[in-house]
Amino acid sequence: MKIINEDLASLKRLVQTKTQQLTDLKVESAVREIIANVIKNGDAAVKDYETQFDKVTLTDFKLSQTVIDDAYNNLDPQVKDALLLAKRNITSFHEKEKATGFIDAEQPGVLRGQKLMPLNRVGLYVPGGTAAYPSTLLMSALPAKIAGVNEVIMVTPPQVDGINPAVLAAAKIAGVDAIYQVGGAQAIAALAYGTESIPAVDKIIGPGNIFVATAKKQVFGQVAIDMVAGPSEIGILADDSADPRQLAADLLSQAEHDRRARPILITDSADLAQAVSDNVTSQLKVLPREAIATDAVNEKGFIAVVAKIEEMFDLMNTVAPEHLEVQLKNPTQYLNLIKNAGSVFLGRYASEPLGDYVAGPNHILPTSGTARFSSPLGVYDFVKRTSFIQYTKDALAKEAPAITTLARVEGLEGHARAIESRFDTYYD
């Protein structure tokens, strides 16, 4: 794993360059065509794309409840227990995110407030094949259910041998209302616009490949989306108290996700940097997903050596990683130095996969530097806020002069006259 010793300004330029994402114009065009076809031809277009891309011919998109129940009932008990533990912890954490509206009646004759309402229907995209992650389904569906979403539906690519049983079991555990065997950009189009069989949703949640991500970008505005997810990232801050073998293992835990994944270590110890690099090399040789992880390490990964701890945090805040591990002496004392990170793991026993599965905080996180302005998925992503006001005549009379003055300053005479009509002033 490459080790970089440069000044802080040069390192910042390096990480910003590595964060930049290029638009693939061919993908943009192909996805635009898929969406237009689904809008025009509905189920027929979706079936054609499933035959073309997933090599599966479907007569019915919706999966029967019998198939879902069988997957749950026949699931390995150890896997089922792990999913149920994850559900308990995810639920207990996200229950604490629930917010309430408010009513303000402090001013005489004035009632103001805000009410929170759950979305009516959301769609969860769950990748298929080797990227079928039941944990991600729990992280998507459970906050929606806690928020009170009326209907949670799931789409996932059909498989020749059937959908991953653990994913189906997780859907049942999380209370998903319906599952449709549809994948790719055509699934996103179906969720956004609806077809004869698949209902349109209010928001689309979940990661996918570049076609799914591009489709989510293109349908945004017709529906809400959670985020446009990029490759997985891990940033680790470590001093000489950290174990280089553990640091290497944590870096590889994300590198094995994707050839474009980004594993980064920033340290003030040159000796630790070399030890971690050596351990990454040796651990890669025995990793089942060696080829994928090796590409990620070589193309996107690096170890940066800086002069002091403050520079470590300064540089990492520029990275704004999806996952941030702080493996320093007394890590909690540095929480106030963390400005940009999707999720933070403090100390050597808070290894990143703990958050992936059972700790409880959501693992659907901002990537590609978007932790500068974005947050993890949560209950708040499945509710909308609506404000309301009520005034008595006397209360309106008190504020009418200010309203009409501002309306006329903005050249909106009709606004002013609407207020004046409440006091029998008309311009007929």
UniProtKB/Swiss-Prot annotation:
Family of this protein: Belongs to the histidinol dehydrogenase family.
Annotated pathway: Amino-acid biosynthesis; L-histidine biosynthesis; L-histidine from 5-phospho-alpha-D-ribose 1-diphosphate: step 9/9
Alphabetically ordered keywords of this record: Amino-acid biosynthesis, Histidine biosynthesis, Metal-binding, NAD, Oxidoreductase, Zinc
Binding site for substrate: S232, Q254, H257, H323, D356, E410, H415
SUPFAM superfamilies according to UniProt: ALDH-like
Functional description taken from the UniProt entry: Catalyzes the sequential NAD-dependent oxidations of L-histidinol to L-histidinaldehyde and then to L-histidine.
Biological process (GO), any one: L-histidine biosynthetic process
Gene Ontology cellular component list: cytosol
Protein name: Histidinol dehydrogenase
Record note on cofactor: Binds 1 zinc ion per subunit.
EC number: 1.1.1.23
Reactions listed under catalytic activity: L-histidinol + 2 NAD(+) + H2O = L-histidine + 2 NADH + 3 H(+)
Cofactors required: Zn(2+)
Record gene name: hisD
